[in-house]
Amino acid sequence: MEYSYRTKINVLFIVLILFVFAALGTAINAPRRKLTKKYRGPCMAVNSIDKCWRCDPFWAEDRQKMADCALGFGINAMGGKYGPYYIVTDNSDDDVVDPKPGTLRFGVIQKGPLWITFARSMRIRLTRELIVSSNKTIDGRGKYVHIANGAGIKIQSASNVIISNLRIHNIVPTAGGLLRESDDHLGLRGADEGDAISIFNSHDIWIDHISMSRATDGLIDAVAGSTNITISNCHFTDHEKVMLFGANDHAEEDRGMKITLAYNHFGKRLDQRMPRCRFGFFHLVNNDYTHWERYAIGGSSGATIISQGNRFIAEDKLLVKEVTYREKSTSSVEEWMKWTWITDGDDFENGATFTPSGDQNLLSKIDHLNLIQPEPSSKVGLLTKFSGALSCKIRRPC
């Protein structure tokens, strides 16, 4: 069958149109697709924290070097440095009143500094929330360690805690009852809410290279006067309310809260609270925000938020462009205009916007604080390239 000249022209025109739309779609989605491409080249330490320890083939022979690598407000978190090593050999969590030696629960309740590692890759289903005491490091490097399908981690009235290189997901609420809180104290606790990591009345905390998704409540909550916290190199996906810093608008004890978010990737299928802040001081530096629905950064109660060198890529939806959200202040613009929210050197893509407020000269007055110096936002894709739990191998660069 022969086609007419006009038919051939129409077919060619349709093919050309389809090609143009395909090319435009690729261009629009290119930044997101690059983020999901798996890197298979040589080890790269791409940000100020990772450069402290990564890519040394002998990292596993001096694991405690990592305790010197925190930056930001959690810089003094030493974890279990100078303490002995404890190796988790048993992935069970059957007895929360008298935990078995070899389990993770037995390790985290011991007195004194302890550096906790894992004998093999394992999946741990916590039957009750895991109470982590002071001067502990949970170090999952070199193994694939999942905390999943059970309770989450609770850091309560503790200091000097490091949690590194875990995969935490599908966290659910668990019932109350008797629970071993330390090696010499048994407590009666209420039901937990299903947070993946909950920080309560604690200080000097560092959470690094954690992959987190799908908890019943928050992925990371910090409340009740908690402060001096750094959350870095983490990868968050598949969650509604990601982070809550400050329990409520009456929690005056949170006025001194200071938290750093650095080199994190806020990824697919996230909704809001990245973070949601109250009262304190929050430094968000060189993070990659590639997905949000309601908002990315929210707050109330006079929270101070400094956003530096971050990348914000808005969704294609017309009404999902604004990064910020002020809660409980819609009736009083005069109120939230006093809250200091600064954007400095951020990159806004696909129509993303950020509404600043308050003292825009604050950066010149806070040189005394432990702030990570931001790198250009054009480098954020590289700085966060290895966010989440790493696939480290012993005697190889990590």
Swiss-Prot record:
Cofactor(s) required, per the database record: Ca(2+)
Enzyme Commission number(s) of this protein: 4.2.2.2
GO MF term list: metal ion binding; pectate lyase activity
Metabolic or biological pathway, per its Swiss-Prot or TrEMBL entry: Glycan metabolism; pectin degradation; 2-dehydro-3-deoxy-D-gluconate from pectin: step 2/5
Active-site residues annotated for this sequence: R273
Residues spanning the signal sequence: 1-27
Name of the protein in its database record: Probable pectate lyase P56
Species name: Solanum lycopersicum
